[in-house]
């Protein structure tokens, strides 16, 4: 199966900062962004998160005012939780879970 981009959005992750969250048919990636205030340009930086969907163990939403799309993923020394501030939290959580279910 070829990898296809399903969703992409500017977001903020609690520990990683500002960036672009991308969901594909095979993985979740987070690319750091750099902004320049003088000309309002935004530049993609390095990919600092690249998680195969098969390593995602749990997806959920949390927050009352500042809602977050959350995932837990297996990493080399255990498990890590990431919390992304995205526009449509429910849509992101559902789409991530649907992409994981499609792997099976």
Residue ranges, per PLM feature:
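Short acidic, Gly/Pro-enriched loop/turn segments at secondary-structure junctions
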Residues: 35-40, 55-73
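Anionic N-terminal interaction surfaces
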Residues: 1-26, 31-33, 42-49, 63, ...
């Amino acid at each position: 199966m070829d990898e296809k981009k399903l969703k992409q959005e500017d977001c903020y992750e609690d520990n990683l900062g500002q960036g672009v969250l991308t969901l594909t048919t095979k993985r979740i990636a987070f690319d750091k962004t750099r902004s320049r205030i003088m000309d309002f340009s935004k530049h993609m930086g390095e990919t600092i998160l690249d998680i195969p969907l098969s390593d995602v163990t749990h997806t959920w939403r949390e927050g009352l005012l500042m809602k977050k799309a959350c995932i837990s993923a297996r990493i080399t020394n255990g498990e890590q939780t990431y919390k992304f501030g995205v526009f449509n939290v429910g849509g992101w959580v559902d789409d991530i879970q649907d992409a994981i279910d499609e792997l099976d």
